[in-house]
UniProtKB/Swiss-Prot annotation:
DNA ligase that catalyzes the formation of phosphodiester linkages between 5'-phosphoryl and 3'-hydroxyl groups in double-stranded DNA using NAD as a coenzyme and as the energy source for the reaction. It is essential for DNA replication and repair of damaged DNA. This is DNA ligase. Zn(2+) binds at residues 403, 406, 422, 427. NAD(+) binds at residues 32-36, 81-82, 112, 135, 169, 285, 309. It holds the Pfam family BRCT. Belongs to the NAD-dependent DNA ligase family. LigA subfamily. GO terms for biological process: DNA repair; DNA replication. GO terms for molecular function: DNA binding; DNA ligase (NAD+) activity; metal ion binding. It catalyses: NAD(+) + (deoxyribonucleotide)n-3'-hydroxyl + 5'-phospho-(deoxyribonucleotide)m = (deoxyribonucleotide)n+m + AMP + beta-nicotinamide D-nucleotide. It comes from Thermosipho melanesiensis (strain DSM 12029 / CIP 104789 / BI429). The keyword Manganese applies. Residues 584-662 form the BRCT domain. InterPro entries: BRCT_dom, BRCT_dom_sf, DisA/LigA_HHH, DNA_ligase, DNA_ligase_AS, DNA_ligase_CS, DNAligase_adenylation, DNAligase_N.
Length: 662
């Protein structure tokens, strides 16, 4: 029994280390497959020996439970807000005031990026995660412990057994924000207005399994009572936090004077659009903790820190029209067309209005002057209406009575749904958008069929559903303007080749609502073929890790549809692969790590990656000293130069194939 306990503890430490490498350092040293194997082994042991379970095990970051509400908790020390400024003059006044109060000619400052997320305070006892509290009103916050445990960059055990309270910011990366909103709009859910709202809405979920799926992230920047750890400056504290295993923002800098602060602010004003998280300014802190104590604080904010905010990326323009777009699931999305404006160096003339409820809430009309802002510094969005500029000639934007494409009926699938959909199952626009996913690299990967060809094929009524693509003939394609004999032959060759597509990518191509690449892979591995998947019950699906009630319901509904059954039968008759192949594996590449750069001739990157992993090797997204080979295709990127500097062996695609066959 002692050996079992030791093995569980060993696995926890190993997984925690790999979590730190992946989520904090962004430098993994094992493949996803190896990581999943370790985690699965730990889950099995904890289930088999529940007396050795721990609330701070890495297994607590997956799955989740439902609570009835959040308990109110008082902070050990208040979480104060910051005074802020938007201009250089006031930041110089702040510097002069600090120097005057301290009676010094110069003061050192730490400049940190001001992450626009949700502030959190986290307490550890003997290195073990104990409690997380939201900022709330600064005095009392909500106990959000279970939800914060699901954030992969927040350690459940520290590298050293300190009892410590730290503070930081929880945020949703822009890529995750865009991904969520895309799915939300496709499924008729309310999208989030910006990444901050997305983080706030997620962290307040009563079901922590939802938090686990939304991939929130964090930066930790503050230690309560730093003198307890012999720390004298904020700069030392940031380094100390890194050593404990926290994710600390690497963009922070140390400034000796106010000119350095202003230069950094100007630099980040321009560069913030390149970040994968939303920042709205800098936080300027006096570096020396002794000086911070002397300066003290008011009832609302510390005197030793200030937020130096960026100017808003917001401009006024006039809406000249509203376009109605139909997605693959039939959802009708209104898009505002407005007079072009330059928004942070980009000419913008359109922005999604999400849904008709959003339009009604903001009372947006054609002819209105509105403010356009970049949500997260990236996505143009209508944020408010300038109602005082109305003339009375503005036109209300009404919910359409029929589909703007096919004139079919429109409505909601359920009473609670926000989205308005085209209810015509044969709407050509729905088919066009679905086909774009079907032929994409993440699905059947049929090159030569782009958006324009899809539009022409559907408009010519050559296909009525996605399965019809496998029944196209040279005669059919000859009717499409712009396609010569060579192009037709190439397209048909690609269609034939795509019949061997792995099951997980076939599932992506089916376009099941709420089922993306990751879920498709889980389903393929679990059910092995389309017949078993199509007959899976809700109860079977809900037991699978990472498949929640909504996804399970969506899968069952999809396969119960008569049209789906017809499509599956047509795919079978066409000879499309509908089962997971058992791949023979070898250890030829065991212990070897590969990176890939440039365009490959015979295989896609995913195919090469699969071959490497099937033969015991690993694939890294970056080149490091641990990389053994770089496979270089045509037009290689920066990885090639780095590989040369590190003396990594560079091989061609042909060399790699010889290595495998040898």
């Amino acid at each position: 029994m002692k050996n079992i306990k030791e093995e569980i503890e060993r696995l926890r430490k190993e997984i925690e280390y790999h979590n730190y490498r992946y989520y904090v350092l962004a430098d993994p040293i094992i493949s996803d497959e190896e990581y999943d194997r370790l985690l699965k082994k730990l889950i099995e042991l904890e289930k088999k020996y529940p007396k050795f379970s721990s609330p701070n095990s890495p297994t607590q970051k997956v799955g989740g439970g439902v609570i009835s509400g959040f308990e109110k908790v008082e902070h050990t020390t208040p979480m104060l807000s910051l005074d802020n400024t938007y201009n250089e003059t006031e930041i110089k006044e702040f510097d002069n005031r600090i120097k005057r109060l301290l009676n010094r000619n110069s003061v050192e400052y730490v400049c940190e990026l001001k992450i626009d997320g949700i502030s959190v305070s986290i307490r550890y006892e003997n290195g073990e995660f104990r409690q997380a509290i939201s900022r709330g009103n600064g005095i009392i916050g909500d106990d959000i412990t279970e939800n914060v445990k699901k954030i992969k960059s927040i350690p459940l055990r520290l590298f050293k057994k300190y009892t410590i309270e730290v503070r930081g910011e929880i945020f949703m990366p822009i890529k995750e924000f865009e991904k969520y909103n895309k799915i939300a709009e496709e499924e008729g859910l309310q999208p989030f207005a910006n990444p901050r709202n997305a983080a706030a809405g997620t962290i307040r979920q009563l079901d922590s399994s939802i938090v686990a799926k939304r991939n929130l992230d964090s930066f930790i920047y503050y230690i309560v009572n730093p003198e307890n750890y012999s720390l004298k400056t904020q700069w030392e504290a940031l380094d100390f936090l890194k050593k404990l295993g926290f994710k600390v923002n690497r963009q922070s800098i140390l400034c000796k004077n106010v000119e350095c602060i202003i230069d950094f602010w100007k630099k980040m004003t321009k560069e913030r659009k390149n970040l994968d998280y939303w920042i709205d300014g800098l936080v300027i802190k006096v570096n020396n903790f002794e000086f911070q104590k002397i300066l003290g604080e008011t009832s609302k904010s510390p005197r030793w820190a200030i937020a130096f905010k960026f100017p808003a990326i917001k401009k006024k323009t006039k809406i000249i029209d509203v376009e109605l777009n139909v997605g693959r699931s039939g959802i009708i999305t209104p898009v505002a067309i407005f007079e072009p404006i330059d928004l942070d160096g980009t000419i913008v003339k359109r922005a999604s209005l999400h849904n008709f409820e959003y339009i009604q809430d903001k009372d947006i009309r054609i002819g209105d002057y509105v403010y356009i802002e970049k949500a997260g510094g990236i996505i143009p969005q209508v944020v408010s209406v300038v109602k005082e500029k109305r003339t009375g000639l503005e036109k209300e934007i009404k919910i359409p009575k029929s589909c703007p494409v096919c004139n079919g009926p429109v409505g909601k699938l359920t009473e609670d749904e926000i989205a308005i959909r085209c209810l015509n199952p044969h709407c050509p626009q729905k088919l066009k958008r679905h086909l774009e996913i079907f032929v994409s690299k993440s699905a059947f990967d049929i090159s030569g069929i782009g958006e324009k060809i899809i539009d022409k094929i559907v408009d010519a009524k050559l296909i009525k559903d996605i399965a019809d693509i496998f029944y196209l003939t040279p005669f059919d394609l000859a009717q499409i303007s712009g396609l010569g004999q060579k192009s037709i032959a190439k397209i048909l060759e690609q269609i034939e080749k795509s019949k061997k597509t792995p099951l997980n990518r076939v599932i992506v191509g089916l376009g099941i609502p709420m089922v993306g690449e990751k879920t498709s892979k889980i389903l393929a591995e679990k059910f092995k073929n389309i017949e078993k998947l199509s007959s899976a019950t809700y109860d079977e699906l809900i037991k699978i890790e990472n498949i929640g009630p909504e996804i399970a319901k969506s899968i069952v509904t999809y396969f119960q549809n008569e049209k789906t059954k017809e499509i599956i039968n047509k795919l079978k008759k066409a000879g499309v692969n509908l089962e997971e192949k058992d791949v023979k594996k070898s250890d030829k590449l065991k212990g070897l790590t590969f990176a890939i750069t440039g365009k490959l001739k015979s295989y896609t990157r995913e195919e090469i990656k699969k071959i490497i992993e099937e033969n015991g090797g690993k694939v890294s997204n970056s080149v490091s000293s641990k990389t053994n080979f770089l496979i270089a295709g045509e037009e290689p990127g920066s990885k090639l130069e780095k590989a040369k500097r590190l003396n990594i062996k560079i091989i061609s695609e042909e060399d790699f194939l010889k290595l495998i066959s040898g």
